[in-house]
């Protein structure tokens, strides 16, 4: 019996002796990289121009007689404020959005019931040059200290032979590149 108690005590003693110890184990986990860019101060986009709506109006589908024919121009302006020419002297604008299936340079007005067909929205700079969507800026405008206004034109453009009536809304977002 004494032997059994001694054996039981000898087997339980190491567990009680180690119960208060905590063992920390450090294993290799991996590498981390932190990446980013700190940009110099550029222009501030006027608040109302960040969520702009350009009213294209109502246009008869009979007005379009050929592929590539445009509607009357609808001007719009992106206002830049608090610009510094110390950082950059020129700015380029790129427009991005869903391209029309027949003409990748213009914005799609969508598909489905009630949507106009064979029509897209084409964007132009203030000199009348087409600004193809989803491409880097091709035309650069001079920046002025303080405020700079960037003038553009939107036009409906026939992308097929027969334009049909319906909703003709397109959506785009723009990015600014400074040089």
UniProtKB/Swiss-Prot annotation:
Tree of life domain: Bacteria
Disulphide bonds in the chain: 43-83
BP terms from Gene Ontology: cell adhesion involved in single-species biofilm formation; pilus assembly
One Pfam family this sequence matches: Fimbrial
Signal peptide: 1-19
Keyword vocabulary terms for this entry: Disulfide bond, Fimbrium, Signal
Main location: other
Example of a GO cellular component annotation carried by this entry: pilus
Subcellular location per the Swiss-Prot or TrEMBL entry: Fimbrium
Family: Belongs to the fimbrial protein family.
The protein's name: Fimbrin-like protein FimI
């Amino acid at each position: 019996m004494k032997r059994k108690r001694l054996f039981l005590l000898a087997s339980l003693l190491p567990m009680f002796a180690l119960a208060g110890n905590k063992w920390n184990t450090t294993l290799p986990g991996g590498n981390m990289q932190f990446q980013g860019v700190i940009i110099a101060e550029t222009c501030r986009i006027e608040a109302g121009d960040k969520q702009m709506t350009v009213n294209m109006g109502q246009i008869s589908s009979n007005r379009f007689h050929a592929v590539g024919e445009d509607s009357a121009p609808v001007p719009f302006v992106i206002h830049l404020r608090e610009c510094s020419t110390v950082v950059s002297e020129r700015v380029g604008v790129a427009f991005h959005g869903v391209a029309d299936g027949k003409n990748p340079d213009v914005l799609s007005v969508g598909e489905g019931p009630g949507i106009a067909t064979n029509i897209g929205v084409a964007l132009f700079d203030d000199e009348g040059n087409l600004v193809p969507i989803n491409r880097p800026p091709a035309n650069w405008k001079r920046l002025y200290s303080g405020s700079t206004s960037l003038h553009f034109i939107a036009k409906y453009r026939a992308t097929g032979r027969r334009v049909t009536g319906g909703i003709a809304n397109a959506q785009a977002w723009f990015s600014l590149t400074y040089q």
